[in-house]
Amino acid sequence: MLFAQKSNQVALFNGKDLTGWNSYIGPPLDDAGKQLSDIPVGLNHDPNHVFTVVDLNGENVIHISGENWGCIYTPKEYSDFHLHLMFKWGKLFWGPKKGKKMDSGVLYFSVGENGADYGAWMRSQEFQVEQGNCGDYWGVAGGMETIPVIKKSDSEYVYSPNGVMTVFSAKSSVGRHCIKQGDAENLTGEWNTLDLYCHGDTSVQMINGKVMMVLYHSSQDDNGKISPLTKGKIQLQSEGAEIFYKNIFVEPLKAIPAEYLQAK
């Protein structure tokens, strides 16, 4: 399927190679997820070719093998933007993810040092990309969001537009994970679209045209100091599973469309 680029969109993937991206890979892990070394593989050093560009059915796409935990990320920071991309799962599992749901993620508003979370990722807000859970939220290394939710169980909270506004962070009583509403993911092996709208401290996470969650008051906890988190780099995770990405575009955003903020 051909993708029509808008005039104000900037392609983050040139369709040829990984020019315009940095890579970072954390310490190697055993099958239980334990670090085999304290030393990360490092910045722009990818001996296992975790991040490559491959020809898939006649189309060049980004291939993330998942063999090591890490990411590719934009050197540039973004605020007030719309990010669009497409992804689909491969078949490979590695290490602690063997036999589990295939997992990746789009980490936005990424700031600070590489490896702040699990030795692999910067502080950020995570748009979860995981089989059956695409659209969930995770706060990464101090990322915090306020989300309207209903309580599903003692430990699970689900996004609901009319729910109780609740702060999600590693230090809050509800934790740093919020479950999206509904399920819009296509069958494994099919391409999915991901759209992320961010303006100010508000974000909308969408899968295949459906609003999964609206998030408010994006902020960060830096050793007890709380401050806004509204600008940062974009990371694409490698987290133990094979995944492909393509058609990655970002464009400036003057306002989040009202219909997405009000979606039920």
What are the functions of these language-model segments?
Residues 5-264:
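Carbohydrate-interacting regions of secretory-pathway proteins
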